[in-house]
Structures are given as C-alpha cells and as structure tokens.
From Swiss-Prot:
Belongs to the universal ribosomal protein uS14 family. It comes from the Eukaryota. Its main location: plastid. InterPro entries: Ribosomal_uS14 (IPR001209), Ribosomal_uS14_bac/plastid (IPR023036), Ribosomal_uS14_CS (IPR018271). GO terms for molecular function: rRNA binding; structural constituent of ribosome. The keyword Membrane does not apply. This is Small ribosomal subunit protein uS14c. The lineage of its organism: Eukaryota, Viridiplantae, Chlorophyta, core chlorophytes, Chlorophyceae. Part of the 30S ribosomal subunit.
Amino acid sequence: MAKKSMIQRELKRQKLVMKYATKRAALKEQIKQTTFLKEKLSLHRKLQQLPRNSSAVRLHNRCMITGRPKGYFRDFGLSRHVLREMAHQGLLPGVCKSSW
C-alpha cells in the first residue's frame, strides 16, 4: 500500500488540474492564435506562472484502493493485484477467467 501522503498528493494534483484546465487551455489557444513574438512571450510567461501541479502531465495513475502506481489498469482504475483479487471474488461485473 502506498503512503497516504502520496495518495493525497495525487488527489491534490487532480484538483489543481481540474481547477486550472480552462485557464490553461485558453492561454494555449491564445499562444497558437497570435503571430506577434512579444505577445507570445508574455502569454508564455502567464502560462508559466500557473502552478506546476496544474499541468495534466504531472498526474500519475494510481490504484483507487491501494495507491499503487505500477501495474495500473485504466479500464478499472485498479492495480493488477487488486484487479485479480476482485475478479476472483466476482466483484467486477463482466470479468471472468479466460479458458481456451
């Protein structure tokens, strides 16, 4: 299980990304639209002044239950260990053991 501080840090980043998403997208669009170099530089400075953690690139997928960062399945939001256990217990609808 991941440290609680790491899980909370990721949640904080997710909140920041959602909070600044529209502002960040608007600035990026303005940068794309403008042709003047000085205006582009000033817009880049505004973009850089936003909090670092408000960028979606800094998010890392983590298991919802354990907080494990590796072996993450996007479809379920779980790590491979938890996914396997929940599938064996029948807690995931539509998931069954494969046999061929």
